[in-house]
Amino acid sequence: MPAVLSSVLSNITDFVVHEGNGVKGLADMGLEALPKQYVQPEEERITTSTVIVDDTIPVIDLSEWGSDPKVGDMNCEAAEKWGFFQIVNHGVPLEVLEEVKAATYRFFRLPAEEKNKHSKDNSPSNNVRYGTSFTPHAEKALEWKDFLSLFYVSDEEAAALWPSACRDEALTFMRNCDAVIKRLLKSLMKGLNVTEIDGTKESLLMGSKRINMNYYPKCPNPELTVGVGRHSDVSTLTILLQDQIGGLYVRKLDSDEWVHVPPINGAIVINVGDALQILSNGRYKSIEHRVIANGSNNRISVPIFVNPRPNDVIGPLPELLESGEKAVYKNVLYSDYVKHFFRKAHDGKETVDFAKIN
């Protein structure tokens, strides 16, 4: 083993986390075996025995949304029964999708010292964060992923703080998704018989946004690790753009079986987050999902997390309780909920139980 590689493997946390090389830095060294720090327990790896190959999440064509009320009904049904669905003919131009994917590659191809300017130790703002894995300090086994996380405050702050390699494309993607986000949330509220979205509800549903750029390098021994471990999102909705490589798996409702989310050119994946599960009193389901590592290809994805504001209190919507439903969840300060999620390793649906009424 070359001396440089031997030195890196003996100080992986420094190389990957503190020096900003990420797992891309490891992959670029041509590793032939997965470092032990990334070997996941067997129960956290996906196996062929737990995957259903002839089933997948719904694909909903939005082209007739304005004229066919069934389209809105299909969105609500998918949110209830799957918590995940893909949308096509959504109005976001294909070139916008392609440009933000290209910008993601452009950022991660920057030298490590350039990317590391945005790390937890070096970034001038908590709203811009480059990192690796999920919570390296809390994980027994690391995840095979690097990421850039950008919390949106204003165009002015983005212009000042977001990396120039991907800033404009990230903002354009977010802006182009705004109309479909609002329409989806309005449709999902209608399914709960909530007909008016006032200022308070608008804040609860979409008061803040974060866009991530995820990079999953080609991996030696991909069957021993994960790109992302089992989790559900803390958002109201997540709007996900994935590339053509594949690897996203979703747990079927009330099952231990998983289905693959096949890439569809031009499609956007939508999933319900914990905040919407709580607001809907459990009607809409925030579902566990995970990403496998790939031994042949690099993979990217670009999620937009649509969230309440940090100082919002989330709980079942009053309209649901007024109609006689019993509250399944207590009221929780959203920032407390998010802190609970980020202080530990990925652990399936444990976070939403934090808000359950016992």
Swiss-Prot record:
Superkingdom of origin organism: Eukaryota
Protein residues bound to 2-oxoglutarate: Y216, R299, S301
Oxidoreductase keyword on record: yes
Pathway: Phenylpropanoid metabolism
Sorted UniProt keywords: Dioxygenase, Iron, Metal-binding, Oxidoreductase
Pfam families, per database record: 2OG-FeII_Oxy, DIOX_N
UniProt domain Fe2OG dioxygenase: residue ranges: 200-308
Function (record text): 2-oxoglutarate (OG)- and Fe(II)-dependent dioxygenase (2OGD) involved in scopoletin biosynthesis. Converts feruloyl CoA into 6'-hydroxyferuloyl CoA.
Family: Belongs to the iron/ascorbate-dependent oxidoreductase family.
Protein name (Swiss-Prot/TrEMBL): Feruloyl CoA ortho-hydroxylase F6H1-1
Organism the protein comes from: Ipomoea batatas
